[in-house]
Amino acid sequence: MDYFDYSYKHNYIEFSSTIYRVGTYHYNWHGETEILILLKGRIEMSCNDELFTLEPLDAVIISPQVGHSTLALEEDVIAFTIHVGNEFYQQYDPDFGSYQFVVRSDESTRHNQFFTTLRHHAAMMLLLMAKGESPVH
């Protein structure tokens, strides 16, 4: 069940975002970079054969074409995802589409400056979209 679904395309940037209830095992991959921020509950996530658990406020950044899956470990688990098209990154690095990476927070990094800033900007983008304003300035 999606609570929020938004897409945006303008010149050099294309992205979509969704807030949804995480349920049963869901395996996928896509051509965009995915940022997942866990808002509520706990999930088990697998990325390129690495299995880990996410807690509320944890974030994961997954490069294009990296297979990944999520599984709710309890009821009423809510996640916020942002998918960013490759064109945005390829204007800075033409080889970006060939990279594979997974960057994730855990208990020791959840509140560091990088992940705190990532969550802050994601929340600000969400607020602008909800108000009908452009999230890109």
Across the structure, where does each feature detected by a protein language model lie?
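Short, solvent-exposed positions on alpha-helices
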Residues: 132-137
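A hydrophobic/aromatic-rich effector-binding and dimerization subdomain
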Residues: 2-16, 67-131
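Conserved metal-binding segment of the jelly-roll/cupin
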Residues: 54-67
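Generic protein-terminus/edge-of-domain signal
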Residues: 1-56, 96-101
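Conserved GNAT-family N-acetyltransferase fold
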Residues: 36, 60, 82
